[in-house]
């Protein structure tokens, strides 16, 4: 069977959207000598992973239709070596594959929504449903690893399903395309590509800073798309007004539509993210483990994803059961780093602010129920989140000896076991303290 014959069969058998987005990129390479393994190649790792997880049975079915065989399907990443001449030809004659390929797992369904990202999510869904109608441009900003790219690509995936033409690039790719087109005197191709789409998605727009010639080109691209009521969505790590080296006319245009921020997730959202990511990756975690990860890690979703990969790899490669001690061992160094960065005065300030008392009250001789409770929480969190010894804590809080510290830690542990409200207060404060290091 040739690639052409295979594509003819699978186009008839597959959903048309799946065929256009993923399956038509398959290149049939060979079948093993015993006819048991059929090997295909594709030039994008996300597409390869998606096809492996979703379409191997369908591909097998195509072989059954063709000759009655049912080989095992292997999907490999293409590593063909091409001459510089061939690469240049592809770049000038074809649409950039990188600019249109989206990670198929980045959808609205797989995005965990919480108070920290609700507005950005709602706005993204609105523009994906009706591109160019409202919130144009949509400017999503926030810290690294909080889900901006996920939302951006979810807009693209959703818009494609509705029949729109979508271009997705990082601003670096846009700049590289622009430079390449000038060098090869092919600006017509460049402008047709970026100005004729229904939806333009630009990641990390802040890196346009200081690039005067590219800013000029992007200004005209923006105007043409906006005037034609085509949707523009951008992400950045800061507001347009805060991007140094960006011309004022672009700053003002970036704020024509809606700016929506993605904030650090709260504890509940972080727990939901861990639950969702572990479910999608087939990792079974107990509530105890999920809470441990949520309260001890920084807030980057990428870091959470990395930890889940490590847990899964350790469990499968070492044939280990996923238990709390196992996860604690894996995260030991990351938690150690957290402890080195958290300072005792910061804990006092955050607890006092949360419980509406003065920081000085916690270090005072006051024994009211509110102050005593706040002091107990501080002592517990200092032991949990720092390397301070009990004598150090007693000295800092002006207490006579460390036996009172030990008593408060014991009491806090008892309350965590019995009182759900106290436990939630502790978890929320722990999360706030870790967040404060950002």
Curated annotation (Swiss-Prot):
Q: Which GO terms describe its cellular component?
A: cytoplasm; plasma membrane
Where does the record place it? Cytoplasm
- In this chain, the stretch annotated as Domain IV, binds dsDNA covers 316-438
**SMART domains associated with the record:** AAA, Bac_DnaA_C
| GO function terms (MF aspect) | ATP binding; ATP hydrolysis activity; DNA replication origin binding; lipid binding
Segments carrying the region annotation (Domain III, AAA+ region) are: 101-315
Signal peptide (UniProt feature, chain positions): none
DNA-binding as a keyword of this entry, yes or no, is yes
Q: Give the residue ranges for region: Domain I, interacts with DnaA modulators.
A: 1-71
**InterPro entries linked to this entry:** AAA+_ATPase, Chromosome_initiator_DnaA, Chromosome_initiator_DnaA-like, DnaA_C, DnaA_dom, DnaA_N_dom, DnaA_N_sf, P-loop_NTPase
Which UniProt key words apply to this protein? ATP-binding, Cytoplasm, DNA replication, DNA-binding, Lipid-binding, Nucleotide-binding
Q: Which domain of life is it from?
A: Bacteria
UniProt: ATP binding residues: 145, 147-149
The UniProt entry, under Pfam families, shows:
Bac_DnaA, Bac_DnaA_C, DnaA_N
Name its GO BP terms in alphabetical order. DNA replication initiation; regulation of DNA replication
Which residue intervals make up region (Domain II)?
71-100
Free-text comment about domains: Domain I is involved in oligomerization and binding regulators, domain II is flexibile and of varying length in different bacteria, domain III forms the AAA+ region, while domain IV binds dsDNA.
Q: What does this protein do?
A: Plays an essential role in the initiation and regulation of chromosomal replication. ATP-DnaA binds to the origin of replication (oriC) to initiate formation of the DNA replication initiation complex once per cell cycle. Binds the DnaA box (a 9 base pair repeat at the origin) and separates the double-stranded (ds)DNA. Forms a right-handed helical filament on oriC DNA; dsDNA binds to the exterior of the filament while single-stranded (ss)DNA is stabiized in the filament's interior.
What family does the database annotate? Belongs to the DnaA family.
Q: How does it assemble?
A: Oligomerizes as a right-handed, spiral filament on DNA at oriC.
Which NCBIfam families does the record associate with it? DnaA
Put simply, this protein is called Chromosomal replication initiator protein DnaA
Which organism is this entry from?
Aliarcobacter butzleri (strain RM4018) (Arcobacter butzleri)
């Amino acid at each position: 069977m040739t690639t052409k014959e295979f594509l003819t069969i699978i186009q008839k058998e597959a959903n048309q959207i799946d065929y256009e987005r993923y399956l038509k990129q398959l290149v049939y390479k060979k079948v093993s000598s015993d006819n048991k393994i059929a090997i295909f190649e594709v030039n994008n790792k996300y597409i390869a992973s998606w096809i492996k997880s979703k379409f191997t049975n369908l591909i097998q079915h195509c072989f059954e239709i063709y000759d009655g065989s049912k080989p095992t399907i292997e999907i490999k990443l293409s590593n063909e070596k091409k001459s510089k001449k061939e690469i240049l030809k592809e770049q000038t004659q074809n649409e950039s594959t990188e600019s249109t390929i989206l990670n198929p797992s980045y959808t609205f369904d797989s995005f965990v929504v919480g108070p920290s990202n609700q507005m950005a999510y709602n706005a993204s869904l609105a523009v994906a449903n009706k591109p160019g109608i409202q919130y144009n441009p949509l400017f999503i900003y926030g810290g690294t690893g909080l889900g901006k790219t996920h939302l951006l690509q979810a807009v693209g995936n959703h818009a494609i399903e509705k029949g729109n033409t979508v271009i997705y690039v990082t601003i670096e790719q846009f700049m590289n395309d622009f430079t390449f087109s000038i060098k090869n005197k092919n600006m017509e191709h460049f402008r047709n590509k970026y100005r004729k789409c229904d939806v333009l998605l630009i990641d990390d727009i802040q890196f346009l800073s200081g690039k005067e010639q590219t800013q000029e080109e992007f200004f005209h691209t923006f105007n043409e798309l906006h005037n034609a009521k085509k949707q523009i969505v951008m992400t950045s790590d800061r507001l347009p007004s805060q991007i140094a080296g960006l011309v004022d006319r672009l700053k003002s245009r970036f704020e024509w539509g809606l700016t929506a921020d993605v904030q650090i997730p709260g504890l509940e959202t972080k727990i939901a993210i861990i639950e969702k990511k572990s479910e999608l990756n087939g990792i079974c975690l107990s509530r105890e483990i999920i809470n441990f990860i949520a309260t001890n890690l920084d807030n980057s979703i990428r870091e959470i994803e990395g930890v889940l990969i490590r847990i899964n790899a350790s469990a499968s490669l070492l044939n280990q059961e996923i238990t709390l001690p196992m996860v604690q061992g894996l995260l030991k160094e990351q938690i150690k780093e957290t402890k080195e960065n958290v300072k005792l005065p910061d804990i006092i300030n955050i607890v006092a602010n949360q419980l509406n008392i003065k920081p000085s009250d916690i270090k005072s001789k006051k024994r009211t129920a509110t102050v005593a409770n706040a002091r107990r929480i501080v002592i517990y969190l200092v032991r949990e989140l720092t390397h301070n010894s009990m004598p150090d804590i007693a000295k800092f809080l002006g207490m006579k000896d460390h036996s009172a510290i030990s008593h408060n830690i014991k009491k806090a542990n008892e309350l965590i076991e019995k009182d759900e409200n106290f436990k939630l207060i502790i978890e929320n404060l722990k999360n706030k303290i870790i967040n404060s290091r950002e």
